[in-house]
């Protein structure tokens, strides 16, 4: 079996990235090595590596409520690129819980990278 182990994301300023992701993920880093410029967080079963030399990647984080998360981040001065919206309705369980809407929003992290926030909600009527 193959599983996703780690995602690397570019960070010019590791201290700034550390503060941003500590607040966003609600946890302290799992590891910090400078030099050479590596900052690790645990995100479920996947390591998030913030590294000076990494290319920019796009990550998606599952949150309980994308609308509430966006409002909290906006209050902290985070740039919201795209407001929460329904991206997909799941009829079966291939990509998400059946009978749910997948809502996404996009923001810029402290290093200018695009980050997606995702939550699932029961399909709304109408």
Short names for language-model regions:
Residues 37-39, 57, 101-105:
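Short beta-strand micro-motifs in enzyme catalytic cores
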Residues 1-3, 51-56, 98-99:
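Short glycine-enriched loop/turn motifs at secondary-structure junctions
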Residues 28-33, 83-85, 119:
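Conserved catalytic-core motifs of GNAT/GCN5-like acyltransferases
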Residues 2, 8-48, 68:
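Core segments of cupin and vicinal oxygen chelate
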Residues 14, 61-114, 121-123:
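Vicinal oxygen chelate
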Residues 1-15, 57-59, 118-126:
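N-terminal beta-strand motif that seeds the catalytic metal site of vicinal oxygen chelate
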Residues 40-44, 52, 107-110, 120:
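Active-site beta-strand termini and strand-to-loop segments that position acidic
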